[in-house]
Amino acid sequence: MQEQYRPEEIESKVQLHWDEKRTFEVTEDESKEKYYCLSMLPYPSGRLHMGHVRNYTIGDVIARYQRMLGKNVLQPIGWDAFGLPAEGAAVKNNTAPAPWTYDNIAYMKNQLKMLGFGYDWSRELATCTPEYYRWEQKFFTELYKKGLVYKKTSAVNWCPNDQTVLANEQVIDGCCWRCDSKVERKEIPQWFIKITAYADELLSDLDKLDHWPDTVKTMQRNWIGRSEGVEITFDVKGYDNTLTVYTTRPDTFMGATYLAVAAGHPLAQKAAANNPELAVFIDECRNTKVAEAEMATMEKKGVDTGFKAIHPLTGEEIPVWAANFVLMEYGTGAVMAVPGHDQRDYEFATKYGLTIKPVILAADGSAPDLSTQALTEKGVLFNSGEFDGLAFEAAFNAIADKLAAKGVGERKVNYRLRDWGVSRQRYWGAPIPMVTLEDGTVIPTPEDQLPVILPEDVVMDGITSPIKADPAWAKTTVNGTPAMRETDTFDTFMESSWYYARYTCPQYQEGMLDSKAANYWLPVDIYIGGIEHAIMHLLYFRFFHKLMRDAGMVTSDEPAKQLLCQGMVLADAFYYVGENGERNWVSPVDAIVERDEKGRIVKAKDAAGHELVYTGMSKMSKSKNNGIDPQVMVERYGADTVRLFMMFASPADMTLEWQESGVEGANRFIKRVWKLVYEHTAKGSVAALNVDTLNDDQKALRRDVHKTIAKVTDDIGRRQTFNTAIAAIMELMNKLAKAPQDSEQDRALMQEALLAVVRMLNPFTPHVCFTLWQALEGEGDIDNAPWPVADDKAMVEESTLIVVQVNGKVRGKITVPVNATEEQVRERAGQEHLVAKYLDGVTVRKVIYVPGKLLNLVVG
C-alpha cells in the first residue's frame, strides 16, 4: 500500500469495483435472513444537499452492518420524480419537465455513487415513467370498482399562482407553502380515496409499531382524531330541513344556548337571500384561510341568520348563527355551542352578547365563576333538570339514552381524518385513469387502454397544464363511443405510497407486485426519513399497504417495522444589510470569521469587506444561503471523511451542526488509521496469535480490543447510537498507536486488532476500509467479510481495582487478582505506601470489605 492516504484515488477505484462486481445486487434467498433497509426516496431537484447525505449515510451504515452479520440485505434507491418544482424549473429554463427531471436524475445518481452508497442499482425506479405509474392507475380503477374511490365537488384551497389545489397542511398563514401567494377558496370536482374506511385500523395498528418514534405515533393518532360522542338533530323554525350536530360532551347539552353553521351551509345561504350583512360575511369566508392549525388562533366572527332552532329536550328556541370557525367539510357543517363550558363558544358568546348558561359545578361543588373564562373540566351536573347530580360518564349515558329514546340522537364514533383528495390540476403527474362518456357517465379507463400515458414532449406556458390546453389529448373512445379523459393528475403522494413495495420486483410485468418477492422482503426492516413526513406521507404509506394487503398482494399489516427520523443539518448563517435595508445572505464558506477563546464567532466579514451579522446555527436552506455543497466537501476531503463526520458529530435523531473543523478532525482520524496499518504492514508478514502465551500488557490490550467490539456491536445494532460506536473505535485506536511492536506476539495482536478496527469502521468509511482490508490480507473482499465477534474469554478481567479507605476517607487504590481473598487484599493494602502511613502506630479495630470494590479500615 502507498504511504499517503489519497481518497481521490482509492474511492473511484473501489466504486468501480462495486459496479463491476455488482456487489450490492441481491435476489430472494430463503436460506438467509433478509433485511430491507430503506431511506425515503429523493426528489430529483438537481443536486444532493447535506440533508440527503445524512439520511442516506445512516441507511448505508445500517445496511452494510446488517450485511456483515450475514443477512441478505436489500438497499434500493429511486426517484420521486413527479411534482410541481419540475414545472416551475421547466418554464424558467425554457424546457419541458421530463428532460429537466431525467437530467437531474443522471446528475444526482453520480453524486450518490460518489458518496459510496451500497445500493442495488438494478432496482432503480423513477415514478414518472409509465412502467411505474401504469400499475398505480390500474390499482386506482380496481379501488373504484370496490367503492373506495369517488368524485365529489368540494371547497378547496386554491393557489392562484401555481394554479393548483393545496391540502390544508400546505396552507401556512393563509398563504401557499411553496410560493407564498394568498390562498383562495374554490369549489371544484375532485377524486377521493376513502382512507376513512381504514381509520380504525390505521389507529389501532399504531400499537403494533413498537419501533416507531412515539412523537410520530402521537401525531398520527391526533390526525386520525377518533372520538366517541352523540349526533343530535334539531328542528329549525321556518326551515324545511333539520340541523344535525355532533358533540363529544352530551353531558353539557342542557347548556347549549346557540348553534353555529358554516358560511357555506344551505341554511346560511337561504338566510343570506334577505340579509345583506350575512351575504357579505359569506363572501368574506369564502376567501379566508382554513388551515386547521390557524382555526384556533384566528379571530372568531359571525352573523345571526335569524333562524331559531328548537332544543330537543327543553323546547327552548335558540339562535342559529353563521360563524367562520365552522367548516362545511368537517362533520355536518353545524355545531352546538355551550359557552359556559367551551372556551371558543365562550369567546364568541361574549363578543356577540349571547346567553351563557352554566351546567357543570366547579371542582369544589360551587357554581362556576364564568366572569373571565369557560369551565372546560368535566364535573357534576346542575341546572340540568332531571340530570342534576350526575357525573360525566353517567350524564353522558343518561342524556344520550334520552335523545335516542326521543329519536333525535344517536351515539357515534367520529374521526377528524378526511378522505384523501388525490386530484391535482397540474400537468407533471400521473394522469387519473377515468373517462366521461357523452351521456355524462363517469367510468374507469378500460384496462386495454392503460396506462394513460402523460405526453412528455410539451411546451409549458407556466399557467395551464398542457394536457388541459390540448383538447385532442382528452379525446378517446370507449367501446366505439366518444369519451373524454380526466385531465387532472394524481397527487404525488400516490407514487411515494407504494414505491417501497415495487422495489421488491421492479421488472415484474404481470401486475403491480410479484407477491412472492414482495412477501419475502416486506415489511421494510428500517425506514429512514425526516419527521416532517409524520402525518402525510407516513399515513398514506401505511394506508396503501393495507389496500395492497386487502387486494391479496402482501400479507403483512404494516409496511415498516422500524422508523428512524434523522435530525436536521444546521450551519452558520450570516447576512449583511443592503442599501435598501434588505438582508443579503452570505454563504458560511465565504464568511471570514473571528472567534473568542471558547470558539464562539464574535466578528465576521465577507471578501468584499461587508460586516456580517451572525444569526447562529439554522437549518441549511436556500433562503439563508447556508447550504454546504456535499460535492465540494467530497472533492476536498473524500467521501469517507464526509460520511464519518455525519455519523460522529451527533446522534442520528438529533440535529447535526456542520463544522468544518469537525470534518477536518474526521479526516485526521482516517489518516491515523491509514498510518498505523501502513506501518504495521511495512514490517512484513505476521505470525499466528497464540492467546495462551500473552503477557499481562498484551492481555489487557486484547481485552480492550474485544470490549470495543462488544460495545460497537451493541451501539450500532441495538442502540443505534452510531456516534458512540465511532468514539469507542477512536479510543481503541489511541491505545493501539501506543502499543509496543517489538515481539512476534505484539505484531500478531496488532494484526487481530487492526482487522477488527477496519471491519468495525467499514459501514462508516467503506472505501478506505476496502483498501486497508486488502493491505492487511483479510480474506476476500471486506464487503463479504463477517462482522467481528467479541471473544468472551478475552474480556474477562484478571485483576480488579479496590478503593482503600481509612476511617471512611479514600487513602489509595490497589490492583489485586479478581479471585483474591480478603486477607490477600488487606495484605496488599498494607504494602501500598499511601495507605501504610495512616496505619503507622494505630490499631485496626474493624474491617469492612465489599468484595471486588472497597476495603475500609477503621482505626483508633
UniProtKB/Swiss-Prot annotation:
InterPro entries, A to Z: aa-tRNA-synth_I_CS, aa-tRNA-synth_Ia, Leu-tRNA-ligase, Leu_tRNA-synth_edit, M/V/L/I-tRNA-synth_anticd-bd, Methionyl/Leucyl_tRNA_Synth, Rossmann-like_a/b/a_fold, tRNAsynth_Ia_anticodon-bd
Cited SUPFAM superfamilies: Anticodon-binding domain of a subclass of class I aminoacyl-tRNA synthetases, Nucleotidylyl transferase, ValRS/IleRS/LeuRS editing domain
Residues the entry annotates as binding ATP: K622
CDD domains: Anticodon_Ia_Leu_BEm, LeuRS_core
Cellular component aspect of the GO annotation: cytosol
Protein name according to UniProt: Leucine--tRNA ligase
Residues annotated as transmembrane: none
Record keyword Ligase present: yes
Chief place of localization: cytoplasm
Motif ('HIGH' region): 42-52
Family: Belongs to the class-I aminoacyl-tRNA synthetase family.
Keywords of this entry: Aminoacyl-tRNA synthetase, ATP-binding, Cytoplasm, Ligase, Nucleotide-binding, Protein biosynthesis
